[in-house]
Amino acid sequence: MLARPRKNIYDNKINQNQFLQRVEKIIDSGLKFLELPWEDNDNWLTLMQRLRLKFPNIQIGSSTIKNKKSIDDSLHIGLNFSMMRFWDKELFNYSRENNFLLIPGLRQLNHLNEAISYNCKIIKIFPVKEKEPILDLNNFKKITFIGAGDLSIKDLNNYKSLGYKAIIIGQKGFDGENFD
């Protein structure tokens, strides 16, 4: 699940604690992966460290990776993975050099072959709703695809039937306070 907390969560301990309580509820319901968009903000680092300490048994990652600093921050706090919004082979190589899982986000399908040539085994397709009629996942048996873009928990079964191994629950499924 991709959680996009409201900006005031980073500066307000009460809001952080409420957010952590909400996250705990969905973890108790079976959530295995959680990612929050990277922010160039010390308070983001603090919140992510709190998540890492409070929930050591789930996979926690960062999204919207844009530069080497965002990867360095994710490495520094011990995140399990990060996701790029767009394909960037320089960032992908930097992540690989640092032995860190960076999942490419492909907005343009013409980048798919390039990502595969870099031996990407997990690829995020964004926005998935625009790509579903033209992308046959059965042609890529060794790749794990993740669907993203305006999806909710209610979309899970549909995208699983299309061959996606996971979907990212975004703003449609989590408005910053409530889960659908």
Task: Cite the ranges covered by each PLM segment.
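Conserved N-terminal beta1-alpha1 strand-loop-helix module at the mouth
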Residues: M1-G78, Y94-N99, I153-K154, S161, ...
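Catalytic cores of alpha/beta
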Residues: N67-N80, N110-N119, E132-L135, K141, ...
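Short low-complexity, flexible loop/linker segments enriched in glycine and/or proline
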Residues: Q49-L51, E97-F100, Y118-K121, N139-K141
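Short beta-strand segments
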Residues: L2-R4, I146-A148, G170
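Glycine-rich phosphate-binding active-site loops on the catalytic face of alpha/beta enzymes
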Residues: F81-L91, I125-P133, L162-D180
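Short, flexible coil/turn micro-motifs enriched in small/turn-prone residues
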Residues: P56-I58, T144, K165
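Catalytic beta/alpha-barrel core
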Residues: K32-N41, I58-K66, I71, G78-D88, ...
